[in-house]
């Protein structure tokens, strides 16, 4: 396996050389790599001689001295040579040549998400190592892999004195000075048998591990946002799900154990009333004890009202792309290349395989349409075995191995996500899939090869993931959710060798690629921990505010509510800016109780949420929209009327004394809003001083298709404290 991994890594490097700038040019010639697939099995085949013959034929020169740069002849077949553009075109058409691409200067790759956000490795990023080492992240998930290099305690001292937890991970499970605590609520032991918990924990706080990859894909340094911090794992999930009672027990223990914040990449398909939501209840208790809870928004997008984790005392995270993605090319027998999506580590050794469309291999039990979608029991095994199965949808993933196919090509509705499969596979968007179908219908012997996945860079980003759950918030309609977005697409992080990289996958890996708001959530948890290392006495709401008000604005890339604040909240997280926000919106337990009273919750319900006996009075009750939240949102009763809505807010100075902030309003989308800020200038003489203001929004004839929005920015010339303002009329 080590040899295979090494050759796969080398091949992967060669296949991504077309991503950078050209490095070698001689006159009008430049160095190209001619990739020819696997080595010939013929005993009399000599690669270098073949390469020289090809060059002589293409160039018309008997002596090719200075032309041949390098022959690849041990693990695969190919060569590098100095060619003109016309020579490159000729060699690309020759039999046996898979692809020709320019030579480039390469740099070692990282897993990119933290670099993408500006939190770079080593001395490039300001750190507070002593405080970071005292920071404890509680991970409520499917457990953890203690042997992972991401959780090695090399260089770590003993746990912080505040730590009161235990290591009760079960048999053959040992904690250390990095992984300082483990608890199990499933009777299986805390060891991660799935991989999800290991992945999220390493994303938030994993050590920097060089040369990590998924069989050579994404090779580079994998690390968490706060590598010097400690981890405590709380296992609440099994393959059948995560029980409410286990979740609450984990919150209970984590808070008492002394964690500084909690990351929980768990949720429901839709939001629940707070009193019925174990995460909302647990997070309320965490907030009351000074512990921030970061929660995933859910993977039920792009449909509206699908976001979960909507309580204002939770930092709710959507998922978006980074500047790196993965593509898998499908080369058809006619030479045409289609670009698909998957994370395919398999190599088909340069060999084309026969293609068979599911509907052309229909079993007697189904019609051609069902077989075309490769539905269960609809494909005849005898007509598929040894071939690449083509399916009109992802249903083929369930049957492809059982019918004996050697690969799979399917139509995918998700253009932005690459998944791992247990055999060579690629998902094609409709246009490319139709090209594939046309090819299938044009020949009696269609063939293709699915190439190993390549990394692509500098794509448009960040873009909100299609799967990321959207608002509006149906439980607290005047609280904008999700709050923030972060990298959650094709994230490489530590994994459990006991888990499967994909369903029915027999491979065992230490690092894997996953997508979901489960992946974006620990990114924000890592940012929250990073912010806390510079501001250890900050409350959860101050950290949440800092993250939200310093976020990058996200440009709408689509239409409808799926591309509005209901998709990304305040924007894309910016770790460096969040560590020094200038001003924050601060909240405590009493503010949240006043908010709940304003939602007309009964004393009985309030006790369920807060654990305390609370009697609401007018003095304690506030309109939900007047909660001192970093974003501002209001749901109105109708779209055709003139309206006026106000928001009351208070800012706390956490920057410098004697600072003055001036307000500015930037228009968003939807109907035009008239926004007035009173007062429009705030002056702070001291640190921790508070100043209040009112936002008055007026307008008429609101757009009923999308929310209407604007952005309020307070600036002192150094800090820009931005809050989205959203007004809407329906649940869409």
From Swiss-Prot:
GO terms for biological process: proteolysis. The C-terminal propeptide is autocleaved. Residues 25-109 form a propeptide. Residues 113-579 form the Peptidase S8 domain. This is Subtilisin-like protease SBT4.13. Keywords: Autocatalytic cleavage, Glycoprotein, Hydrolase, Protease, Secreted, Serine protease, Signal, Zymogen. Residues 352-436 form the PA domain. It comes from the Eukaryota. The keyword Hydrolase applies. Its EC number is 3.4.21.-. Residues 31-108 form the Inhibitor I9 domain. It is found in: Secreted. Gene3D superfamilies: 2.60.40.2310, 3.50.30.30, Peptidase S8 propeptide/proteinase inhibitor I9, Peptidase S8/S53 domain. Glycans are attached at residues 172, 219, 458, 555, 600, 648, 658. The active site is at 141 (charge relay system), 196 (charge relay system), 518 (charge relay system). One of its GO terms (cellular component) is extracellular region.
């Amino acid at each position: 396996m080590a040899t295979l991994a090494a050759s796969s890594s080398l091949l992967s490097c060669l296949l991504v050389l077309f991503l950078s700038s050209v490095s070698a040019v001689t006159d009008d010639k430049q160095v190209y790599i001619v990739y020819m697939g696997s080595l010939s099995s013929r005993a009399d085949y000599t690669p270098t001689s073949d390469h020289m013959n090809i060059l002589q034929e293409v160039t018309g020169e008997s002596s090719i001295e200075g032309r041949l740069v390098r022959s690849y002849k041990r693990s695969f077949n190919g060569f590098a040579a100095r060619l003109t553009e016309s020579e490159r075109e000729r060699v690309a058409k020759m039999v046996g040549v898979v692809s020709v691409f320019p030579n480039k200067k390469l740099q070692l790759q990282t897993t990119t998400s933290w670099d993408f956000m500006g939190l770079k490795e080593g001395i490039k990023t300001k750190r507070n190592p002593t405080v970071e080492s005292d920071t404890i992240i509680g991970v409520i998930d499917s457990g953890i892999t203690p042997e992972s290099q991401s959780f090695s305690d090399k260089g770590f001292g003993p746990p912080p004195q505040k730590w009161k937890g235990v290591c009760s991970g079960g048999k053959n499970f040992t904690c250390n000075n990095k992984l300082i605590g483990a608890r199990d609520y499933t009777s299986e032991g805390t060891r991660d048998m799935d991989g999800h918990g290991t992945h999220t924990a390493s994303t938030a706080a994993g050590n920097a591990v060089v040369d990590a990859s998924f069989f050579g894909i994404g090779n580079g340094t994998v690390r968490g946002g706060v590598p010097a911090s400690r981890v405590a794992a709380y296992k609440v999930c099994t393959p059948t799900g995560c029980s409410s009672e286990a979740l609450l027990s984990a919150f209970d223990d984590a808070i008492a154990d002394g964690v500084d914040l909690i990351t929980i990449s768990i949720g429901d398909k839709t939001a629940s009333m707070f009193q019925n939501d174990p995460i909302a209840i647990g997070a309320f208790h965490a907030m009351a004890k000074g512990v921030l809870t970061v929660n995933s928004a859910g993977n039920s997008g792009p449909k509206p009202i699908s976001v979960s984790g909507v309580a204002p005392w939770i930092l709710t995270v959507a998922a978006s792309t980074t500047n790196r993605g993965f593509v898998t090319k499908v080369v058809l027998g006619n030479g045409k290349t289609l670009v698909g999506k998957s994370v395919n580590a398999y190599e088909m050794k340069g060999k084309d395989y026969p293609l068979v469309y599911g509907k052309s291999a229909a079993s007697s039990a189904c019609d051609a349409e069902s077989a075309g979608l490769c539905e269960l029991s609809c494909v005849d095994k005898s007509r598929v075995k040894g071939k690449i199965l083509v399916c009109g949808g992802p249903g083929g993933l369930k049957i492809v191995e059982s019918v004996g196919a050697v690969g799979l090509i399917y139509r995918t509705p998700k253009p932005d996500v690459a998944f791992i499969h247990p055999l060579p596979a690629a998902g094609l968007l409709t246009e490319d899939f139709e090209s594939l179908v046309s090819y299938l219908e044009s020949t009696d012997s269609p063939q293709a090869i699915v190439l190993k996945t390549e990394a692509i860079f500098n794509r448009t980003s960040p873009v909100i993931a299609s799967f990321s759950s959207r608002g509006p918030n149906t439980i607290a309609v005047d609280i904008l959710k999700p709050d923030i977005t972060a990298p959650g697409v094709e994230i490489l992080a530590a994994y459990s060798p006991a888990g499967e990289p994909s369903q029915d996958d027999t491979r065992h890996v230490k690092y894997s690629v996953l997508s979901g708001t489960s992946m974006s959530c620990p990114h924000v948890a890592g940012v929250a921990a990073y912010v806390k290392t510079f501001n250890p006495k900050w409350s959860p709401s101050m950290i949440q505010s800092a993250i939200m008000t310093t976020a990058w604005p996200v440009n709408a890339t689509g239409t409808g509510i799926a591309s509005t604040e209901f998709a990304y909240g305040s924007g894309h997280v910016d770790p460096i800016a969040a560590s020094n926000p200038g001003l924050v919106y601060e909240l405590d337990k009493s503010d949240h109780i006043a908010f709940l009273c304003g939602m007309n919750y009964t004393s009985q319900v309030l006790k369920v949420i807060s654990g305390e006996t609370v009697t609401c009075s007018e003095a304690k009750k506030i309109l939900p929209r007047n909660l001192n939240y970093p974003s501002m949102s209001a749901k109105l009763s109708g779209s055709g009327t003139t309206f006026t809505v106000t928001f009351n807010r208070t800012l706390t100075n956490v920057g410098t004394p004697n600072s003055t902030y001036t307000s500015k309003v930037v228009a968003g989308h939807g109907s035009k809003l008239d926004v007035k800020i009173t007062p429009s200038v705030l002056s702070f003489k001291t640190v921790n001083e508070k100043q209040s203001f009112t936002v008055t929004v007026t307008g008429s004839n609101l757009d009923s298709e999308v929310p209407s929005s604007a952005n309020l920015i307070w600036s002192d010339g150094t800090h820009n404290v931005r809050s989205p303002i959203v007004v809407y009329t329906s649940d869409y």
